[in-house]
Amino acid sequence: MSQSETFEKVKKIVIEQLSVENPDTVTPEASFANDLQADSLDTVELVMALEEEFDIEIPDEAAEKITTVQAAVDXIN
C-alpha cells in the first residue's frame, strides 16, 4: 500500500473516531491533541481502530509517539 493510500485510510479513521467536522483539517501535520482536540482516551481508541483496520499491532512505546496524522501513517508503513 502506498503512502498516499495509507494516509487516506488513516484520514477516514481519524474523521470517524474523532468526529471531525471539517475533513480538510485532517492533514499529515495535524496534531491529534492540538489541532483535532483529541484527549488521551481518544488517542488510545484511535490507535486501536488503526490496529484493527490495518491488522497490525502497535506496541505501547510506538503508540505514545503517534501524535500526528503523519506519525500514524509512518507507524503503519
UniProtKB/Swiss-Prot annotation:
UniProt keywords, alphabetically: Cytoplasm, Fatty acid biosynthesis, Fatty acid metabolism, Lipid biosynthesis, Lipid metabolism, Phosphopantetheine, Phosphoprotein
Main location (coarse class): cytoplasm
PTM text: 4'-phosphopantetheine is transferred from CoA to a specific serine of apo-ACP by AcpS. This modification is essential for activity because fatty acids are bound in thioester linkage to the sulfhydryl of the prosthetic group.
GO molecular function: acyl binding; acyl carrier activity
Subcellular location: Cytoplasm
Pathway: Lipid metabolism; fatty acid biosynthesis
Gene3D superfamilies listed in its UniProt record: ACP-like
A GO term from the CC aspect: cytosol
Start and end residues of each Carrier domain: 4-77
GO biological-process terms attached to the record: lipid A biosynthetic process
Role according to the record: Carrier of the growing fatty acid chain in fatty acid biosynthesis.
Family membership: Belongs to the acyl carrier protein (ACP) family.
Protein name: Acyl carrier protein
Natural source organism: Anabaena variabilis
Gene designation per UniProt: acpP
